[in-house]
């Protein structure tokens, strides 16, 4: 593709800027990068690159063009710096693509039993921008730096058109829309041009070796992921559904309300019982529980437990877990741009409830077995057990 690069020139290569466009039926935002790339219909459509600050060239993989051998060598050579904006996306996606196509290149470029390209040798201008106090998105960084060439605005619509499946599950074919496809190729090329300008403008503020070491560690943590006990997750979600069904049925029996989950209906019922309250938030319910008894107190306790019966984290685990039951890509390096602290994605592993159950291993095993009756018998609150 483009000019021929001779082997002597390849040996002198020190840097390569690149950007890819991909497709997958998995929702990237909700299920994460690793699950996105693991999808059977995942593919790399376009790859644009520039060698050592040279001219940007596009490889139209969707229309049968192939990645040159020298580029595969570069991508799998830890001594060649691969520069991209949000480089983890390019690295993980290219890891999957090269493995699928059996284009493995240099063995030194792989780790984790050949699952991923090593993060050593990868450089992320998104992280570089964040450390400099700039926004993280390519578009926002370009605008903040007043770059000569900005990210093309048509890209968002074209990504939706070519990279996200239609309602029937199929993808639009580039060959059916040649003009739009050419625009998409130009968009891909422009992204590399914008990234190169960012890299050049921030040359005086490079990531230090110290920070690069942390970045590599972060990438390795994300690649290895954490093991998810999918049986426990599945049964926890089922237990929560059973608890909610029983609790709502009991609440209907107590109040006679059509929807005892409605704050307005419950407040009206409480007033009929001679109990006035402006709210049913956590603090208000706790205060009412100290001054009520009988059916009112039972209803408030049910209300309190229903408010705790959230299994969003379990549902997130279910969505993110890969085929090997590991959840990957849970940490965003330099996610808090003002402090440089990491942030979490998808499951929010840094924000799990504190454990207060003394025999937690037993409770965990009962949930894993799906033994709802035992959990209900042995513990005060099913939702509280599930939250821990």
List each language-model region with its residue ranges:
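Conserved "right-hand" nucleotidyltransferase catalytic core of DNA-directed polymerases
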Residues: 5, 9-28, 39, 46-48, ...
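Cytochrome P450 core scaffold surrounding the K-helix E-X-X-R motif
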Residues: 25-29, 58-61
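Short, conserved, GDST-rich strand-edge loop motifs in beta-rich repeat architectures
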Residues: 32-35
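Active-site-proximal helix-loop-helix substrate-binding element of RNase H-like nuclease domains
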Residues: 42-203, 358-359, 366, 370-372
């Amino acid at each position: 593709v483009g000019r021929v690069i001779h082997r002597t020139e390849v040996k002198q290569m020190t840097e390569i800027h690149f950007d890819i466009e991909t497709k997958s039926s998995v929702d990237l935002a909700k299920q994460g990068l690793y699950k996105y790339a693991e999808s059977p219909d995942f593919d790399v459509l376009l790859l644009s690159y520039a060698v050592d600050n040279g001219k940007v060239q596009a490889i139209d993989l969707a229309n049968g063009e192939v990645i040159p051998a020298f580029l595969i060598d570069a991508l799998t050579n830890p001594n060649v710096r691969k520069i991209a904006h949000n480089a983890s996306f390019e690295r993980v996606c290219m890891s999957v693509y090269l493995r699928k196509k059996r284009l493995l290149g240099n063995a030194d470029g792989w780790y984790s039993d050949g699952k991923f390209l090593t993060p050593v040798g990868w450089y992320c201008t998104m992280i570089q921008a964040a450390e400099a106090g700039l926004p993280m998105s390519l578009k926002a960084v370009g605008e903040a730096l007043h770059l000569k060439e900005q990210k093309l605005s048509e890209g968002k619509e074209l990504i939706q058109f070519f990279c996200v499946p239609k309602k029937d599950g199929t993808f639009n074919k580039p060959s059916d829309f040649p003009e739009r496809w050419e625009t998409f190729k130009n968009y891909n090329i422009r992204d590399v041009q914008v990234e190169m300008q960012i890299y050049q403008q921030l040359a005086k503020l490079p990531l230090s070796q110290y920070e690069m070491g942390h970045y590599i560690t972060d990438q390795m943590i994300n690649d290895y992921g954490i093991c998810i006990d999918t049986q426990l997750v599945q049964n926890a979600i089922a237990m929560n559904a059973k608890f909610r069904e029983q609790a709502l049925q009991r609440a209907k029996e107590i109040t006679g309300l059509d929807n005892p989950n409605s704050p307005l209906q419950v407040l009206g019922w409480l007033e009929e019982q001679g109990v006035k309250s402006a709210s049913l938030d956590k603090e208000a319910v706790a205060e009412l529980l100290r001054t009520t008894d009988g059916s009112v107190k039972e209803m408030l306790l049910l209300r309190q437990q229903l408010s705790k019966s959230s299994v969003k984290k379990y549902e997130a685990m279910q969505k993110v877990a890969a085929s090997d039951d590991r959840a990957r890509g849970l940490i965003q390096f330099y996610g808090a741009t003002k402090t440089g602290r990491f942030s979490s994605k998808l499951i929010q592993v840094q924000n799990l409830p504190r454990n207060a159950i003394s025999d937690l291993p037993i409770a965990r095993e009962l949930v894993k077995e799906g033994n709802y009756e035992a959990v209900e018998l042995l513990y005060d609150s099913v939702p509280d057990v599930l939250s821990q």
